[in-house]
Amino acid sequence: MVARLRAKPGGDRVAVVVGDMARAEDLPAGAFAVVLVAFNTFFSLTTAEDQARCFAAVADRLTADGSFVVEGFVPDDELIEAGSKVEVRSLTARRVVLTVSRHDAVTQRAEGQFVELTEEGGVRLRPWSLRFAPPEELDAMAAAAGLVLAERWSAWDGTPFTAASAHHVSRYRRPGSSPA
């Protein structure tokens, strides 16, 4: 992924750190104006403790008016109550991708495989595992780390977040810091 970023125009201007975002020692030293965890990546931390450690480590590295931005899906009742399921993710004449997953409402864990079937290549398995958390739980983790919710949208274009939103972009900051 880093190589793909570097190949893009301006990709060399983005600071990239490869490490475990739950381990403070893996994060770079210094103060940052923005720390972004995009596209459900935060949920790749598969325990509540690791998620809370990430908030604390990031809060420790923000400038006085810095922001921590988390993008993720909003767990819905269907996900939480699903148990196990198989869904068609994509289907063409030469390729089928299935999502096979199992969800546990108590642990807020989901694990699964993207199963790719092709005429030419047989079967390819792409495993995944996550711990989902509703925005309110993320807000509590932020508060425990000394951050407050500054803004929340349902999309990057600033669409207002509502109870019906399927996704969120949440920006956290230190209390009393500049709201911008």
Residue map of PLM features:
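A short His-aromatic
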Residues: 43-45
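Conserved SAM-binding strand-loop segment of SAM-dependent methyltransferases
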Residues: 10-23
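A short glycine-rich, Lys/Arg-flanked "PGG" loop and its adjoining helix->strand segment in the class I
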Residues: 50-67
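A short beta-strand submotif of the Rossmann-like class I SAM-dependent methyltransferase core
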Residues: 37-39
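A short acidic, Gly/Pro-enriched loop at the edge of an enzyme's catalytic core
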Residues: 25-35
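SAM-dependent methyltransferase
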Residues: 69-141
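C-terminal lobe and adjacent flexible extensions of AdoMet/dcAdoMet transferase-like proteins
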Residues: 131-180
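Conserved SAM-binding loop
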Residues: 5-6
